[in-house]
């Protein structure tokens, strides 16, 4: 046991040498640890010294010295005990240099970060449950070809008059993964003017549409070929995480493809032809109305996408995270040529297309790009977007564009949507014949609640269109899930999720071992990973006890100690 040197130990050794036995008289060295423990308990509640005083008491080896009489008897001339042999009568290995003379040397230790195995089958259930209620729909099938600069202003691009739409049901397999498809149901239109807007409703016909506007899109470098309707379009938009969050480095290398607006115009032209056929069928079936005639005629746009086996579960969750409200300006659609004829227009019979919202993907008509075009894997599977008229009638002029989910393009970028206002649609044209009043009245009554909701939303969006848009203003979204920012720890095997980026950074220091907070007390070298730990440690130097019991006079330096003490009063 290491003890402070004194003359008693040498007198005890002398007594053993002369008498041959050791006296059982206790000394302070025998109970040194117990004495220090009792003194520490006794002095624990005493006031602490505010400033460290430097004196000769810091090094006790300089105070005590070996008695000269003992050195003479042992025939030791040197004052250093290090030169004494272990075979001498005084078998002592004490060394004065073995102690740290200046007291500044600190202990060193190594920290081992444990890495756990990733369980790929286990998923974050909390995030998926919250995101499952959101509508996933690719914006590629219903948006024109906007070209936007870095400032976020949309500029309509030139639109050609010819379009090529081929009908195919493309399915592909890779590594045993089944392919997914996204269907888009478009309703017929009589005309599409510059004052009309486009809305999209969800799979449920009762869900109201939301006015949205496409903000920004990029081209893949080197892709000068024309993008057909079967391609996907992503938007380059700010992420949901602040720049201080570790997820902010995922915004690099994000490209997007453009969808030309004349493809949409060709689809509208095709639906107009189907509308004329349905009006003739309604006149023939006035006495025997079918349930499918209560809604406007629709057609399915199917985009088949091969699921990417290399995409991780975290990237798939980030894809599902970016749900916002967009709005397409009517100026981008006003230049599209409605009178262009599609050379390859193909769909199933118009009588069956009205029931496509409740049918499976195999029973619906599909319109996709040419078969030689590459298949993109960032289209969500089983996604349906329904294009309906503003008032539910086939002769309405404006269609509206509802909720769209932005998907990530390269698997390493978080794509989030940007809110904008939408212009109110122009006056609708009522071209329904008086002979088909029995059947068209049902469709008008069915779409009346949806028309009221759409008109209310269009007024709100028109009022907010004059406000300048900021990239970080996505918190004004009406959806509660869109307001919630989710910051997930990206270390291997860790599934911690935080709502604040500062909490996530404090948690990540447990993985890295970083301790940026250093104690400023003189002579103290303690460092901490969190600021509250430093504050708690600093109270040990100052002796501050800010937490006082309201039932008695006791004070505590930590709140958890006060909480334990409060249980005694209960």
From Swiss-Prot:
Residue stretches of biased makeup (Basic and acidic residues): 474-483
SMART domains on file: ZnF_C2H2
Source organism: Drosophila melanogaster (Fruit fly)
Region (Disordered): 138-182, 268-297, 332-383, 424-483
Note: Named 'luna' based upon mutant embryo phenotype in which large vacuoles formed in the egg yolk resemble the lunar surface.
Keywords assigned by UniProt, alphabetized: Cell cycle, Cell division, Developmental protein, Metal-binding, Mitosis, Nucleus, Repeat, Zinc, Zinc-finger
Zinc finger feature spans (C2H2-type): 487-511, 517-541, 547-569
PANTHER family: KRUEPPEL-LIKE FACTOR LUNA, KRUEPPEL-LIKE TRANSCRIPTION FACTOR
UniProt xrefs under Gene3D superfamilies: Classic Zinc Finger
An example Gene Ontology biological process: regulation of transcription by RNA polymerase II
Molecular function terms, GO-annotated: DNA-binding transcription factor activity, RNA polymerase II-specific; RNA polymerase II cis-regulatory region sequence-specific DNA binding; sequence-specific DNA binding; zinc ion binding
Gene responsible for this protein: luna
UniProt name for this protein: Krueppel-like factor luna
Keyword Metal-binding among UniProt keywords: yes
Family listed: Belongs to the krueppel C2H2-type zinc-finger protein family.
Keyword Transmembrane helix: no
Biased composition (Polar residues): 287-297, 372-383, 448-466
């Amino acid at each position: 046991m290491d003890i402070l040197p004194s003359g008693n130990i040498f007198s005890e050794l002398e007594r053993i040498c002369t008498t041959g036995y050791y006296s059982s008289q206790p000394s302070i060295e025998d109970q040194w640890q117990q004495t220090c423990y009792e003194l520490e308990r006794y002095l624990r509640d005493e006031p602490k010294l505010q400033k460290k005083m430097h004196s000769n008491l810091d090094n006790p080896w300089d105070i005590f010295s070996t008695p000269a009489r003992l050195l003479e008897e042992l025939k030791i001339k040197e004052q250093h005990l290090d030169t004494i042999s272990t075979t001498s009568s005084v078998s002592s290995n004490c060394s004065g240099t073995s102690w740290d003379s200046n007291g500044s040397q600190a202990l060193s230790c190594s920290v081992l970060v444990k890495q756990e195995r990733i369980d790929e089958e286990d998923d974050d259930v909390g995030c998926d449950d919250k995101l499952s209620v959101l509508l996933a729909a690719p914006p590629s099938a219903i948006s024109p070809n906007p070209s936007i600069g870095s400032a976020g202003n949309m500029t309509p691009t030139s639109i050609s008059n010819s379009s090529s739409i081929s009908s195919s049901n493309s399915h592909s397999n890779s590594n045993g993964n089944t392919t997914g498809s996204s269907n888009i149901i478009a309703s017929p239109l009589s005309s599409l003017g510059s004052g009309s807007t486009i809305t999209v409703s969800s799979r449920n016909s009762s869900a109201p549409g939301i006015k949205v506007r496409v903000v920004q899109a990029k081209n893949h470098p080197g892709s000068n070929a024309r993008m057909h309707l079967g391609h996907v379009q992503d938007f380059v938009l700010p992420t949901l995480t602040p720049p201080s969050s570790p997820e902010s480095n995922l915004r690099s290398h994000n490209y997007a493809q453009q969808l030309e607006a004349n493809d949409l115009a060709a689809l509208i032209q095709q639906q107009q032809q189907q509308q004329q056929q349905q009006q003739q069928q309604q006149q023939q079936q006035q006495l025997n109305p079918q349930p499918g005639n209560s809604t406007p005629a629709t057609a399915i746009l199917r985009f088949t996408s091969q699921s990417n086996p290399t995409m991780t579960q975290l990237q798939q969750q980030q894809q599902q995270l970016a749900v916002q409200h967009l709005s397409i300006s009517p100026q981008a659609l006003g230049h599209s040529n409605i009178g262009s004829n599609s050379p390859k227009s193909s769909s199933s019979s118009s009588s069956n297309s009205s029931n496509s919202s409740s049918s499976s993907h195999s029973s619906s008509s599909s319109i996709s790009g040419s078969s030689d075009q590459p298949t993109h894997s960032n289209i969500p599977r089983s996604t349906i977007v329904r294009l309906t008229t503003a008032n539910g009638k086939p002769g309405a002029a404006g269609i509206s564009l509802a909720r769209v989910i932005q998907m990530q393009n390269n698997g390493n970028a978080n794509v989030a949507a940007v809110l904008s206002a939408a212009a109110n649609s122009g006056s609708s044209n009522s071209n329904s014949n008086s002979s088909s009043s029995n059947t068209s009245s049902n469709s008008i009554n069915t779409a009346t609640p949806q028309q009221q909701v759409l008109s209310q939303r269009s007024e709100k969006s028109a009022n907010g269109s004059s406000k300048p848009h900021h990239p970080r203003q996505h918190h004004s979204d009406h959806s509660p899930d869109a307001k919630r920012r989710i910051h997930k720890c990206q270390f291997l095997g860790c599934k911690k999720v935080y709502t604040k980026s500062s909490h996530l950074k404090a948690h990540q220091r447990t993985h890295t071992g970083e301790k940026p907070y250093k104690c400023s007390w003189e002579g103290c070298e303690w460092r901490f990973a969190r600021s509250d730990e430093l504050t708690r440690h600093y109270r040990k130097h100052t002796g501050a006890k800010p937490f006082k019991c309201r039932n008695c006079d006791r004070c505590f330096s930590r709140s958890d100690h006060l909480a334990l003490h409060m249980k005694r009063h209960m």
